[in-house]
Amino acid sequence: MNRRELVEFVNMCMIKNGNRVLVQDRVSPDWPGITFPGGHVERGESFTEAVIREVKEETGLTISKPQLCGIKDWYDDEDYRYVVLFYKTEHFSGELQSSDEGKVWWEDFENLSHLKLATDDMSDMLRVFLEENLSEFFYYKDGDDWLYDLK
């Protein structure tokens, strides 16, 4: 029995600065709106190296001590698995600058719910970033409907 599966790994990083977090207004037509910086893990790259690289490319900041704090995962209609690695850190250096991915800025954490977020489920994603008893955000299909569990 072959237990291998096709998986795509991406990451997302919550960078905190006091009571503010770094947000990005993505310009991609596939996934527009406000979210945290991040991107794909490249072949041969460690997960930690990937999140450090992606944050640098998208924000100009060099992060350190990124802490893996959870995942979001789902299977598409062709049984291809997607895994988003959630990281958080308060350690960074450099000068903030926007990129082709979108504008970046520091936002008060309590204002996030009032912004045009990239996903409708962002408030539950934030729970996985912040609550120590949660580590997974798992999407699954029930008939034609997409549902999710926080674990």
Regions of interest found by a model, annotated:
Residues 62-70:
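A short coil-to-beta-strand element that immediately follows conserved catalytic motifs
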Residues 20-56, 144-151:
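Conserved Nudix-box catalytic region and its N-terminal flanking loop in Nudix hydrolases
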Residues 1-21, 37:
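Conserved N-terminal beta-strand and adjoining loop/helix that marks the start
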Residues 8-12, 82-86, 123:
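Short hydrophobic/aromatic beta-strand or adjacent loop that forms the aromatic wall/cage
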Residues 73-95, 127, 133:
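Active-site-adjacent beta-strand/loop module that shapes the phosphate/pyrophosphate-binding cleft
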Residues 14, 23, 86-88, 106:
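Conserved hydrophobic/aromatic beta-strand scaffold that supports enzyme active sites
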Residues 128-151:
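Charged phosphate-binding loop/patch that engages nucleotide di/tri-phosphates or the phosphate backbone
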Residues 88, 97-130, 149-150:
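NUDIX/MutT-family hydrolases
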